[in-house]
């Protein structure tokens, strides 16, 4: 049996799909369906059971023969200001799951984030000196990564953290403001014929990775049983304008407008990210990543055909 927390969410549901395609259907999805729209992410997937995230913690020891937990569940809002909630949901919950896995020799693969790097002045490499998060979401991930670092030398089962960079692709419809730039620009283009970018977006560059590539990385490490903390990005920073231009080309038209930069993001916004891949490659992950143009085209076609959902 495999458990996927956040399995009704964006990356989690894509991991469930990847496991299904690999022949695995004995999967428990753990999530919070307060946002009822998320059930749509599960409609076409094969799972054995669903359980609420809070109820799951209360019943941990009742589940037998669990061989791995893909821990993808978290509050992923980079603008959330309730630090107590963030640390309870992202840090304490993760520690409880990790310690349960260590006590029961269950493989534990979890979602970290490139947000731990902050402005990236010290580079985007998996080293403590490169980490200085700009918001409490990033801090919650940073704190758990450092907790993991302290226990790694003693672990006997797999403990694997992946620092996701800017992930885009199907099944993110429920994320609202936190959905990818590609998602928002597509819908702006469809609704108004225009795409709105923050002032300065020509110089904002991020490492955009298609969700299908993050699934491949997860499944690679699930098979290899490697432990550690690794970047999950493409190693190539691209501008927000590059996404708009790609969509413009696919759509055949579309103006690009500048809008004021939101005040609530000032000082908390990563203007540049680019994953260092040396550690990932050294761990045996050799697959090539989708180019931005290829990924945006694939996503454009999915959004046009199915509103970006699995069917």
Which residues does each PLM region occupy?
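Glycine-rich phosphate-binding loop and adjoining beta1-alpha1-beta2 segment
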Residues: 29-56
